[in-house]
Amino acid sequence: MLSKNQVKLIQKLQQKKYRNELNLFIVEGKKSIVEFLQAGYRLELLIATEVFATALNGQPITLVSKEELRKVSSLKNPDEGLAIFHQRQHKGILQEGVILALDNVQDPGNLGTLIRLCDWFGIETLICNSQTVDCYNPKVVQATMGSLTRVAVHYVDLAGFLATCTLPLYAMDLDGENLYTTEFPEDCVLILGNEANGISLEVRALADGIITIPRFGKLQQTESLNVAMAGAIVVSQVRKLDN
């Protein structure tokens, strides 16, 4: 059974302010919880139904009913467990390979998908400016399906980082060179912008190349692609050229 203090802690961690203050975050769902445990994240609290608890030998568990779990979960259909882990502090940014950079991406689902995308394509470093949604937002963590354990997410002064970065910088925009005729080096930074406004003028000015995904529709009336979709297309093309 959950204590009042445990309930209050879970509620607090829905807010970025308290996640940063306490250096904690929430993970929901059996698969994701197991992945964070296996990745060695330090556990603060684990609540689970009896069904899930039987698979977690050796872990300190607070047993709850499905109804109790439902009351503290942010999901419509909670999946047998909720855990609180300590945030992991990543070391310095290694400037090699393909790096993905995000300029003010706001939607948790988009960031979660982009983290999964990095994991799938072997991109280990994701750079975000401070206005990009928090990677420890519960909706982001849920959308990553455990991929957050394998991708280092860094929040930095993006313009400052790009200004001193030694790798070629390619920013995605509607007005740029054709993605499919661009030759990318093995090591580079791919920059994606805000869902509504794209990349900022400051970041655009720092880019070595501006790249666009060409439209093939006859009427050419589609305004833009979802940022996660665009990211998938771009990274896939870069990896294709690597091979």
Language model regions located:
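Short acidic-hydrophobic, aromatic-tinged amphipathic segments that line or gate anion-handling sites
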Residues: 1, 27, 62-65, 149-159
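Active-site/ligand-binding-proximal alpha/beta "capping" segment
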Residues: 171-221
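Amphipathic alpha-helical repeat scaffolds
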Residues: 29, 106-114, 222-228
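Active-site regions of enzymes building and remodeling cell-envelope glycoconjugates
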Residues: 56-67, 97, 168-169, 183-189, ...
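Glycine/small-residue-rich loop that forms an oxyanion/phosphate-binding "nest" at active or ligand-binding sites
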Residues: 61-86
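Boundary-proximal intrinsically disordered activation/regulatory segments immediately upstream
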Residues: 1-50, 132-133
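Structured adenosyl-cofactor binding patch, chiefly the S-adenosyl-L-methionine
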Residues: 120-121, 137, 142-149, 204-243
